[in-house]
């Protein structure tokens, strides 16, 4: 997918999660 410029190492995807991004390999991906 496309990186969503948000990491999810310590906290889950927040803003980008609203855009449909999911956590993969410590980074939020579309």
Swiss-Prot record:
Q: Does the keyword Disulfide bond apply?
A: yes
Q: Can the keyword Disulfide bond be found in this entry's annotation? A: yes
Instruction: Tell me which SUPFAM superfamilies the record gives.
Output: Cyclotides (SSF57038)
The family database entries (InterPro entries) matched by this protein are listed as:
Cyclotide, Cyclotide_bracelet_CS, Cyclotide_sf
Q: Post-translation: what modifications?
A: This is a cyclic peptide.
Name the UniProt key words of this record, in alphabetical order. Answer: Disulfide bond, Knottin, Plant defense
GO biological process: one example: defense response
Q: Where is this cross-link: Cyclopeptide (Gly-Asp)?
A: 1-30
Q: Which residue windows are transmembrane per the record?
A: none
Q: Which domain of life is it from?
A: Eukaryota
Q: What are the cysteine partners in each disulfide bond?
A: 4-21, 8-23, 13-28
Q: Which family does it belong to?
A: Belongs to the cyclotide family. Bracelet subfamily.
Comment, domains: The presence of a 'disulfide through disulfide knot' structurally defines this protein as a knottin.
Function, in words:
Probably participates in a plant defense mechanism.
Q: What is this protein called?
A: Kalata-B16
User: Which species is this record about?
Assistant: Oldenlandia affinis
């Amino acid at each position: 997918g496309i990186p969503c410029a948000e990491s999810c190492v310590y906290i889950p995807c927040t803003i980008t999660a609203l855009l449909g991004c999911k956590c993969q390999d410590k980074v939020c991906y579309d």
